[in-house]
């Protein structure tokens, strides 16, 4: 019983981790590791071809097609061949990435959603654990034992739903704790109004200066 409850919890936890981190992020990490092990030679060839193509382009740009036509034509043929080889290598890596993405998505679905469905259906009649007698009303007891577990027990499907709810609530709590607090709003500046109030005084001072000049 305890092992089954733990297995269902771990499957639910794995599913939630995939949801939290993101499928695309996990796929990118997995493909990077896969490329490092199985596609290192092709990736090295791609880098070498890209470097050679850039060098050939630079040298071709420095060569005059009129004054050095033979050299220019040779460089042009070399550049065209390098571009063709680079495109072929890029297509190989792109095809490998597409194939890996499909296999990874299938494997991830089997390990998360598929495993949860299989466990809930295969152990649908087996109670995960029993509740104390009379601890919950009959409608709640029937709901916890849905679809085929004995009344008074918690079924595999109900246990999986409880685990998902607890993990989702835990995620919300962590996000609310780590979320930055809103910045406090400061007092509204009163600069323009004070400037307006100072204008009459300035006018009075100007008039006083004019009277002094006249005197």
Swiss-Prot record:
Cross-referenced Pfam families: CHD5
Cytoplasmic side stretches: 25-108, 171-215
Any single biological process term in GO: tail-anchored membrane protein insertion into ER membrane
Molecular functions (GO terms): protein-membrane adaptor activity
Spans within the Lumenal topological domain: 1-4, 130-153
Membrane topology, record value: Multi-pass membrane protein
Keyword set, alphabetical order: Coiled coil, Endoplasmic reticulum, Membrane, Transmembrane, Transmembrane helix, Transport
Spans traversing the lipid bilayer: 5-24, 109-129, 154-170
Stretch list, region Disordered: 181-202
Subunit description: Interacts with GET3.
The protein's name in its UniProt record: Protein GET1
